[in-house]
Amino acid sequence: MDEGGTPLLPDSLVYQIFLSLGPADVLAAGLVCRQWQAVSRDEFLWREQFYRYYQVARDVPRHPAAMSWYEEFQRLYDTVPCVEVQTLREHTDQVLHLSFSHSGYQFASCSKDCTVKIWSNDLTISLLHSADMRPYNWSYTQFSQFNKDDSLLLASGVFLGPHNSSSGEIAVISLDSFALLSRVRNKPYDVFGCWLTETSLISGNLHRIGDITSCSVLWLNNAFQDVESENVNVVKRLFKIQNLNASTVRTVMVADCSRFDSPDLLLEAGDPATSPCRIFDLGSDNEEVVAGPAPAHAKEGLRHFLDRVLEGRAQPQLSERMLETKVAELLAQGHTKPPERSATGAKSKYLIFTTGCLTYSPHQIGIKQILPHQMTTAGPVLGEGRGSDAFFDALDHVIDIHGHIIGMGLSPDNRYLYVNSRAWPNGAVVADPMQPPPIAEEIDLLVFDLKTMREVRRALRAHRAYTPNDECFFIFLDVSRDFVASGAEDRHGYIWDRHYNICLARLRHEDVVNSVVFSPQEQELLLTASDDATIKAWRSPRTMRVLQAPRPRPRTFFSWLASQRR
């Protein structure tokens, strides 16, 4: 364009030329003149750049909170925590888990070196305290969680013992004095444990009933167990869950239902016909959608068959393990309490855990509603429920993943459950509960809406794992307002955008990445933990520019007056 004259090229032609350029070239060309600057900010141009650069499906609309395509492109490019800023090497063995305080001022780490370390999260991260758990007969620490007001830390670990030992313990640590306040047994150790309220936590215990049949008992424990009266409860039984085919309850977590109607990001439901996952509402009155008890004639047929077997009048065509499972199912039919319904408007919570019904590997997610009157240790404990024949508690919902579950995490609003799983082959049949199907190397990241109990979107896939079923371990994931991140066995952490379902960053370590966690107050800060014994801190390019920008020199209060007198 001539100075002050008419453009030499029409806008439409400049637009067509800019369409053939990449994002960086478009921005550079926009510095040439005012006309090119105006075209370089065109909304249609940046919509094309966005879909092409990020390879987003064209039927996915723009993020509902975005004001323009240019700003949305900039958000995904500039606010993802992908710049490594600090490496922490204080652990001497594999780092297994990370957790942030709700304020974001502190975080905790657990490791195979059997310590729980508490860190101060500042511009430069520093170590505040290290608790050595070896004096308590722990083998290693595996999980931690801050309570709601950040005054207490729950730390979960594994006891020393034989390779097949499944016992663990939960410790509660004061964040004011770093004193150990209480310890609670936890079996199996991969129940992990979690907070239900600010001062009460959930632990597990396991009782064997048969060779492949057991009962998981979930307990509510008071974090402060130095009570003054023997009439004050420090523990209360929450639920008793029947386990079939060598399965157990593991990986407990609590979802608060109070924010379901005002989510940070509303995700659309996917097509249930294309998903291998099945969700059963066990508390529904609609018999057509309930994966619940068998019909009465089937129950009677099973009962008569077992009676004839016990009396020696029939020869079972089942293996000993299959026969045990049938007997356990029959026992549960008359000794399981139906799901208890909450009153209208009651503030309930969901207890979420992994379980199964076909094999020992966790392939289902159990969901049990916790009602307000169950959220306290007050009330009778010994002899509770003796007047009833109902021994087991029924679940409210079951999600069948059709694969090995290796990680779960909740969105900040608690409405969406994200699940890391390694799929079984299509049509796989479990003939022996001790020999689950082979699992895929690809990790699928599935998303479920806990309000509608439906799967949403398609599975995210980029990360990989290589260990077989019997060596498979947990890969912890985390969810922020806009992003979801996960570790992987391929020596990388991964970050996806929750709305567009695209992978935005790969974060490199020297070994398996076990855990990732966003700062709850600043999603542009992410921590990753690895088998390479390090914790890495990652910040966004935008944050790095702000932190590294030169600060103006302070001027004296009357400096402007002095300049006027010259």
Curated annotation (Swiss-Prot):
Protein keywords: Cytoplasm, Phosphoprotein, Repeat, Ubl conjugation, Ubl conjugation pathway, WD repeat
Q: Does the keyword Protein transport apply?
A: no
One matching Pfam family is F-box-like
Phosphoserine found at: 151, 284
According to its UniProt record, where is this protein mainly located? cytoplasm
Instruction: List the subcellular locations.
Output: Cytoplasm
The PTM entry states:
Phosphorylated at Ser-151 by PLK4 during the G1/S transition, leading to inhibit its ability to ubiquitinate SASS6. Ubiquitinated and degraded by the APC/C complex during mitosis and G1 phase.
Domain called F-box: residue spans: 3-49
Molecular function via GO: protein kinase binding
- Pathway entry: Protein modification; protein ubiquitination
Biological-process GO terms, alphabetical: proteasome-mediated ubiquitin-dependent protein catabolic process; protein ubiquitination; regulation of centrosome duplication; regulation of mitotic nuclear division; SCF-dependent proteasomal ubiquitin-dependent protein catabolic process
Is Magnesium one of the keywords UniProt gives this record? no
- Write out the ranges of the repeats annotated as WD: 83-125, 126-178, 179-238, 239-281, 394-447, 458-501, 502-539
- Give me the Gene Ontology terms describing cellular component: Cul4-RING E3 ubiquitin ligase complex; cytoplasm; cytosol; SCF ubiquitin ligase complex
Family the entry assigns: Belongs to the FBXW5 family.
Quaternary state and interactors: Part of the SCF (SKP1-CUL1-F-box) E3 ubiquitin-protein ligase complex SCF(FBXW5) composed of CUL1, SKP1, RBX1 and FBXW5. Component of the DCX(FBXW5) E3 ubiquitin ligase complex, at least composed of (CUL4A or CUL4B), DDB1, FBXW5 and RBX1. Interacts with CDC20, EPS8, TSC1, TSC2 and SASS6. Interacts with TNFAIP8L1; TNFAIP8L1 competes with TSC2 to bind FBXW5 increasing TSC2 stability by preventing its ubiquitination.
**Record's PANTHER family?**
F-BOX/WD REPEAT-CONTAINING PROTEIN 5, F-BOX_WD REPEAT-CONTAINING PROTEIN 5
This chain's function reads: Substrate recognition component of both SCF (SKP1-CUL1-F-box protein) and DCX (DDB1-CUL4-X-box) E3 ubiquitin-protein ligase complexes. Substrate recognition component of the SCF(FBXW5) E3 ubiquitin-protein ligase complex which mediates the ubiquitination and subsequent proteasomal degradation of SASS6 during S phase, leading to prevent centriole reduplication. The SCF(FBXW5) complex also mediates ubiquitination and degradation of actin-regulator EPS8 during G2 phase, leading to the transient degradation of EPS8 and subsequent cell shape changes required to allow mitotic progression.
Q: Could you identify this protein by its name?
A: F-box/WD repeat-containing protein 5
